[in-house]
A protein has these predicted regions:
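N-terminal glycine-rich phosphate-binding loop for ADP-containing cofactors
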Residues: 1-181, 190-223, 230-233, 237, ...
C-alpha cells in the first residue's frame, strides 16, 4: 500500500475502508478487539483479523495515511497512537482496550496453539524446516515450518533429534503438529527431482533410507508419539502419521498416499503399514489377495480421504485414533492423548 502503482492503490482502496470500518465498530458492537479478529477469522476464513493486520501495517502509519487523504480516523486507532493493538508481556499476549490499557487475551479451556507454546521461549532445536518446543508436562512438540510443511532431510534430522531427546529421558512423549492449514503436503518433490536430475543417486538413497530409519525410530521408540493433523496429510506426511502411536485428527483432515500420481511409490513404510492394517481387519476382503487388491486400488488411484471419518474407513486412522471437531483444540487434545499413553507404554512389536 506504500507504492503508487495499481496494486498499491487497489490494496489501499480496499483495506482503508475495510480496516477503518472494523475499527470504527469498537465499542459499538464489542469493546473487545479480539472478538472482531476471531469473528473475521472463524466466520469469513481470514488469515488475520483486522486489528492483527493493522499491527502489521502499523496503526500510526495507517492513521496518518487516513488523515493525509482527509478520511476519518476511528477513535480506537487514535487512542493506540504509536503503540500496537497486541503486545507480548510476561510470556503472554495482551490486547489494547478502549480504556487505553492492555489486558491478557483469554482463550477457552482446551484451546492451544504453537504460538501459545512458543511465546517467550526459545526452541530446544531448530533448523529451516522444523522446530522442537517444550509443551510442558514433559511432552515435546515437533513443528514443521517448511513450505507447505513438506518433508525434507532437515525435517528428518529434527525428528531424529526429537527421538533422541525422548529416549534420553528429557521428555516422556512427543506430539507432531503445527498451526498451519496443513499437517504436511508430503515429501519435498522439488528437492527429490533436483537430486535425480543431477544423478545424485546416493543422496536419493540417503533420503529414502534416512526417512525409513527415522520413522521407525518413532514407531518403535520407548516413548509415545501422537500426530496432531489437520488439512492435508499427503504422501510422506501421511507416512509420518502412520508411524505414530495415535493420531489426533481434526475432522477436516485429508489423508492419502498420493505418490503414484507423480510416478513414485510410498517409500517410508506407508505400503507396509496399510497392508498390516487391512490384513488385521476381519471385515477386509477375503482371500489371499483381498487386502492387497484394496490397497493397490487406493494407492494406484492416489485416493485421498475427504474427511477424518473417511480416513478411518480407509484405514489411515485406526479405531483407537481420535477425531477433534474444533481445530483450535487439536494440539491440546493430542497432548492429553500423549499423556494418557505414557503410563505402561510399550512400543509395537518390532515386526510391525
Amino acid at each position: 500500500m506504500e507504492y503508487d502503482d495499481k496494486g498499491g492503490k487497489f490494496a489501499w482502496q480496499v483495506l482503508s475502508k475495510t480496516l477503518s470500518y472494523a475499527a470504527s465498530l469498537v465499542p459499538e458492537i464489542t469493546e473487545n478487539i479480539v472478538n472482531v479478529d476471531i469473528a473475521m477469522k472463524n466466520g469469513f476464513m481470514w488469515k488475520k483479523g483486522p486489528f492483527e493486520m493493522l499491527d502489521e501495517l502499523g496503526p500510526s502509519w495507517f492513521a496518518d495515511k487516513l488523515k493525509s487523504e482527509g478520511l476519518d480516523v476511528p477513535k480506537i486507532l487514535e487512542s493506540v497512537g504509536d503503540g500496537l493493538f497486541y503486545v507480548e508481556k510476561d510470556s503472554s499476549l495482551n490486547y489494547f482496550t478502549i480504556d487505553g490499557d492492555y489486558i491478557n487475551v483469554s482463550k477457552p479451556e482446551g484451546y492451544l496453539s504453537v504460538s501459545d507454546i512458543s511465546r517467550g521461549k526459545s526452541p530446544i532445536f531448530k533448523n529451516p524446516s522444523i522446530r522442537l518446543w517444550d509443551m510442558g508436562d514433559d511432552i515435546l512438540l515437533a513443528e514443521f515450518i517448511s513450505k507447505m510443511n513438506s518433508i525434507d532431510p532437515l525435517i528428518m534430522e529434527g525428528l531424529s533429534e526429537a527421538a533422541s531427546q525422548c529416549e534420553s529421558g528429557k521428555f516422556r512423549g512427543l506430539v507432531i503438529g503445527n498451526d498451519g492449514d496443513n499437517f504436511s503436503a508430503g515429501a519435498n518433490l522439488g528437492l527429490a527431482s533436483f537430486i535425480c536430475n543431477v544423478g545424485a543417486w546416493n543422496e536419493v538413497d540417503k533420503f529414502v533410507q534416512g526417512g525409513q530409519l527415522t520413522l521407525m525410530s518413532l514407531k518403535h521408540g520407548s516413548f509415545p508419539v501422537v500426530g496432531a493433523s489437520s488439512g492435508l496429510a499427503l504422501g510422506g506426511g501421511c507416512e509420518v502419521l502412520l508411524a505414530c502411536d495415535r493420531i489426533q485428527a481434526h475432522s477436516e483432515t485429508y489423508i492419502g498416499l498420493v505418490e503414484v500420481g507423480v510416478g513414485v511409490v510410498p517409500a517410508w513404510g506407508g505400503c507396509k503399514e496399510m497392508l498390516r492394517r487391512w490384513s488385521a481387519d476381519p471385515k477386509s476382503p477375503t482371500g489371499p489377495m483381498g487386502s492387497i487388491v484394496k490397497i493397490f486400488e487406493n494407492l494406484g488411484t492416489a485416493k485421498v480421504a475427504s474427511s477424518a471419518q473417511e480416513a478411518r474407513d480407509m484405514k489411515f486412522l485406526s479405531n483407537s485414533d481420535r477425531i477433534t471437531m474444533n481445530r483450535s483444540r487439536v494440539l491440546n487434545d493430542a497432548k492429553e492423548t500423549c499423556l494418557q499413553l505414557i503410563d505402561g507404554y510399550a512400543p509395537p512389536d518390532i515386526n510391525e
